[in-house]
């Protein structure tokens, strides 16, 4: 009887912990306005005519949903020029990662001000923190370059972009349910600036202005509340170069490294192509000669194999962080570049060439393409087969 009562009390305690009320002081109107890029999409007329409180509720609501708290509610109010958030239906410590994000945002704001003082801030840039991410139940960390401006102005969703949408489909191809992919896509951009998608080159000189922000975010997000390391994936050449400059190890595409942003915590990092690189690599206009299309297809198939392997590693490590990173990577490259090359091919032709599934299957069964697939098996024998973008 006593044992049964004790179990019931334990269950009640866990239930209460999962359905607590969290109150958080966000700061002054001025602070919250800049950290939430308010207003997100107003010229003379606002695309969505939201108040500051509604904007904050929107992003905090995204976070609680992506953390898996389906019944959680967010309410934001202003009192004497200070904003406060009340979140119900979340664990008692839920405010801690949110507070850490906003504190890091202050560092980003300072960096942006220095950048502007040096005459390097562009008129069409906006400071944009990774709002709306999974905060408490994140499975892995994605290091990226910068968010496209339309994620802020049109979508008001950090995870709505061609880059993140494509990567989510690759995670799904590796067994992660679509509804759960946001937990794997907690993003840290080394340039916290919403800018036109073509602004990559323009942003190359800004990274050092945000060093305090970048390293703080990596330190805070790369470990769980219990102190365990989360797997990290570094997308694209600028980000992989940043990892080397900041932490030391060289990270090539499908190359593994370990960093220690916190004492005693070893974070596994996998290098990957930028998710959008495949559209450049597979563009026939980038090649010459009568076989330009064939060259583009071959390049695209290689990148698709690399990308599926990287997403496989991310999915596997995120769902079971105790796995050996190198063993997981070997298994993933074997899967997508040796065992399931036909499926790699089909995913390339359906998602990049936009062929119907039946046509993609026929294309991948043709003799010219089958010979190209053998090149995937060759590249799978080498770690870090290419540099990518």
What is the predicted role of each segment?
Residues 8-13:
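Bacterial N-terminal signal peptides
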Residues 15-18:
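N-terminal signal peptide c-region/cleavage motif recognized by signal peptidases
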Residues 1-6:
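Bacterial N-terminal signal peptides that target proteins for export
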Residues 22-81, 202-212, 244-388:
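C-terminal capping/extension of enzyme domains
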Residues 22-231, 237-244, 278:
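A polyanion-binding, active-site-adjacent surface
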């Amino acid at each position: 009887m006593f044992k049964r009562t004790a179990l019931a009390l334990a269950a009640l305690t866990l239930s209460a912990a999962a359905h607590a009320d969290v109150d958080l002081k966000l700061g002054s109107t001025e602070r919250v306005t800049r950290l939430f890029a308010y207003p997100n999409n107003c010229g003379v007329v606002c695309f969505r005519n939201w108040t500051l409180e509604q904007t904050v509720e929107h992003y905090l609501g995204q976070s609680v949903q992506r953390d898996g708290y389906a019944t959680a509610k967010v309410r934001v109010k202003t009192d004497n020029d200070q904003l406060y958030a009340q979140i119900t239906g979340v664990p008692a410590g839920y405010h801690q990662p949110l507070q850490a994000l906003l504190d890091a945002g202050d560092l980003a704001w300072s960096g942006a001000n220095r950048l502007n003082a040096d005459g390097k801030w562009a008129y069409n840039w906006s400071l944009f923190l990774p709002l709306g991410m999974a905060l408490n139940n994140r499975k892995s960390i994605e290091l990226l370059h910068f968010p496209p401006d339309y994620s802020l102005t049109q979508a008001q969703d950090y995870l709505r972009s061609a880059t993140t949408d494509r990567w989510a489909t690759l995670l799904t191809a590796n067994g992660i349910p679509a509804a759960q992919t946001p937990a794997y896509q907690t993003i840290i951009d080394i340039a916290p600036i919403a800018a036109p998608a073509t602004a990559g080159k323009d942003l190359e000189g800004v990274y050092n202005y945000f060093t305090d922000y970048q390293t703080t975010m990596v330190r805070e997000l790369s470990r769980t509340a219990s102190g365990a390391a989360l797997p990290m994936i570094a997308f694209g050449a600028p980000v992989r170069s940043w990892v080397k400059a900041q932490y030391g190890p060289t990270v090539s595409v499908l190359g593994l490294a370990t960093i220690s942003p916190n004492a005693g915590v070893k974070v596994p990092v996998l290098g990957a192509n930028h998710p959008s690189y495949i559209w450049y690599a597979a563009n026939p206009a980038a090649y010459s000669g009568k076989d330009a299309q064939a060259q583009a297809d071959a390049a695209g198939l290689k990148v698709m194999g690399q990308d599926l392997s990287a997403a496989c590693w991310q999915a596997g490590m995120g769902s079971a962080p105790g796995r050996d990173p190198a063993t997981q990577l070997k298994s993933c490259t074997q899967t997508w570049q040796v065992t399931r090359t036909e499926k790699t091919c089909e995913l390339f032709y359906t998602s990049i060439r936009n062929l119907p599934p039946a046509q993609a299957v026929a294309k991948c069964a043709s003799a010219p393409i089958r010979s190209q697939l053998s090149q995937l098996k060759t590249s799978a024998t080498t770690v870090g087969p290419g540099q990518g973008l």
